[in-house]
Amino acid sequence: MSTSIKAIKESLEAVTSLLDPLFQELATDARLGVQKALKSRQKAIQADLAEEERLEAMLSYEKALYKEGYQAIAGIDEVGRGPLAGPVVAACVILPQHCKIKGLNDSKKIPKSKHETIYQAVKEKALAIGIGIIDNQLIDEVNIYEATKLAMLEAIKQLEGQLTQPDYLLIDAMTLDIAISQQSILKGDANSLSIAAASIVAKVTRDQMMANYDRIFPGYGFAKNAGYGTKEHLQGLKAYGITPIHRKSFEPVKSMCCNSTNP
């Protein structure tokens, strides 16, 4: 009696290598369901191998630093430089050496439906996480570039008191005035897993804040646009004016401040 297709599918789920003899054995099974399951599992393994290769490539900066003797490498990234409203948020994340988290990438490349899952995976595996938040008022005072630096420095400061302290910083396209060895990496969130981890932490943290602001200030679509200048947001500005979380140094908010009595 031939093995049921259900049993074959269960056996295939345990296979992790394309060279597994089970593939060759099942290749002669003429049943359509078996061949479909066979191809599906082969495709899944190929995808896993490609993901493993991608993650390994994104550890190149970290691996080079481990060889130099560094032990606790922190990735640093920010989210929220461009929006018209809300804070800029930075995160500093130290992952265990050679840690790989499936699906972890530049947060802009991760489907929104997977943000929370990967965020939780980072939180579970990280040795240390720090978050820095600079509000719109300070952004207006010092400019967004300086505010981004302040958010990053605050994120690093948040690690004080935690068991693991960074001995090297990998920073997304920024250099910080701090006495810790560091490297600025252009598009770091797409090239370093540590920075990618910081990217998703900062992204989810800020999105949660903007969703809360959406409840406080309805009509601007903050939960969907995160404060960026979408059509809905601009219509909200026209209809309701500026809110306490809008950046008065950013256009068109700046012009609205000059031409109205809005606070």
Curated annotation (Swiss-Prot):
Keyword terms:
Cytoplasm, Endonuclease, Hydrolase, Manganese, Metal-binding, Nuclease
Q: Which GO terms describe its molecular function?
A: manganese ion binding; RNA binding; RNA-DNA hybrid ribonuclease activity
Per the UniProt entry, what are the Gene Ontology biological process annotations, in alphabetical order? DNA replication, removal of RNA primer; mismatch repair
Q: What cofactor is this protein dependent on? A: Mn(2+); Mg(2+)
Answer yes or no on keyword Nuclease: yes
In this protein, which residues make up the domain named RNase H type-2? 71-262
Q: Does the keyword Manganese apply?
A: yes
Binding residues for a divalent metal cation, per the UniProt record? D77, E78, D172
State its Enzyme Commission number(s): 3.1.26.4
InterPro entries named in the record = RNase_HII, RNase_HII/HIII, RNase_HII/HIII_dom, RNaseH-like_sf, RNaseH_sf
Give the reactions, separated by semicolons, that this protein catalyses.
Endonucleolytic cleavage to 5'-phosphomonoester
Compartments (UniProt record): Cytoplasm
User: What does the note under cofactor report?
Assistant: Manganese or magnesium. Binds 1 divalent metal ion per monomer in the absence of substrate. May bind a second metal ion after substrate binding.
Q: Name one GO cellular component term.
A: cytoplasm
What protein family does this chain belong to?
Belongs to the RNase HII family.
Q: List the PANTHER family hit by this protein, alphabetically.
A: RIBONUCLEASE H2 SUBUNIT A, RIBONUCLEASE HII
Q: What does this protein do?
A: Endonuclease that specifically degrades the RNA of RNA-DNA hybrids.
Q: What is this protein called?
A: Ribonuclease HII
Q: Which organism is it from?
A: Streptococcus pyogenes serotype M2 (strain MGAS10270)
